[in-house]
C-alpha cells in the first residue's frame, strides 16, 4: 500500500496502466537481495572493474614489458579465470629478474613468471646474487692470471700493474707475507689448469676481458728479482746518492734569494744615508766655530770701545786749576786715546755772534778773548756724542 501511495496510484480502473511500475520496483528489490547474498570480493570486482579499452592507447605496443603488464591486468580482471592470478609481488619479481638477466646468463628460463611459477622473490634474488658473486670471482681470477702471465713473460723488463698495490719490504722475503697472498696462489697452478679455467668461463667474461687494464712499463731500479719471487713488484723509490742526503729539486719559479739589482739598490741607499750623516756633522761643527768667532770679535770690539772712551768721563778735581777757565780745562783734558776726533774746529767770530738777538739776551757771561774762541763748548754736548764719534 505504501508503494501505491508514494507513487500516487489510485484504486480503480487506472491500476492496470501502472502495472509496469510495480514490476520494475520488484525487480530492483530482487537485485539488491542478490547483491547482499553474494561475497563482497566478487561484487567489488564486478562493480569496480576499470575500462581497459580506454587505456590501451597509452601503452607502447612495441615494448614487451608493457604488453606483459597489459596481459596480467586482463588476467586479473577476468571473472571467469579461476586460476591463481598474477599478484603485484610476482610482477615486481619479473621486473627484477629481467633487469638482472642482462648481467647474468646462467639463470634458467624456467624461473620466468610467464608460466605462473611458485618460486618466491627472495629465492630468485638469492640465486641471482650467488651467480653474480661466482662470476665476479672467476673474472678476478682470470684477470689476475692474465696480468701476472704478462708480467712473467716480459722477462727482464719490470712492469707495474696499476690494479694491485703491494706494500712491504723489498728484500728476498716470502711471497706470502705481502698484502695480497691470494694473488700469488694462481701462479703456483699449472698453465694447463689456468687455460682450462679460461675456456670454461669464456661465456661469462667476454665483455670484461675485452676491456683489460693497460699495463705501463717503467724502468724502476728498486725492483729486486729474487729466487722465491721472480715477479716481485716494488712501489718504493730507491735511495739516491748511496746513503747521502739528496738535495731537494729546485722549483723553477722560486725567488727566495735576492737579485743583483736588489743588492745594488740596497748598497746605494746605505751609502747615501752615511754620506748625509757625515755632511750634517761637518756643517754643525762649522756653524759652531763661525758663531764662536763672530761672538768673540763682537766682544773684543765692545771691549775696545769701552777702553778708548773711558777717559772721557774720568775727571779728577786736581786736573782742573782753580784760576783757569772751564773751557780751557776741558780742552786740555778731553781727548781720545786713539785720536778718533780730528774734526775741524769751528771759529766763532764777532759777526756770527751778533747775527741773532736771542743769543745776546741769553748769553750774559763774560765774553772770552779772541785767542780762546777756537775751543769746543764741551759743557753743552752730551756724553753720547763722544761714544758715537769714537
UniProtKB/Swiss-Prot annotation:
GO biological process: cell adhesion
Membrane-spanning parts: 263-283
Stretches the record annotates as Targeting signals: 283-390
Superkingdom in the source lineage: Eukaryota
Alphabetically ordered keywords of this record: Cell adhesion, Cell junction, Cell membrane, Membrane, Signal, Transmembrane, Transmembrane helix
Membrane topology per record: Single-pass type I membrane protein
Subcellular location: Basolateral cell membrane; Apical cell membrane; Cell junction, Adherens junction
Designated name of the protein: Adherens junction-associated protein 1
Organism the protein comes from: Xenopus tropicalis (Western clawed frog)
Lineage, highest ranks first: Eukaryota, Metazoa, Chordata, Craniata, Vertebrata
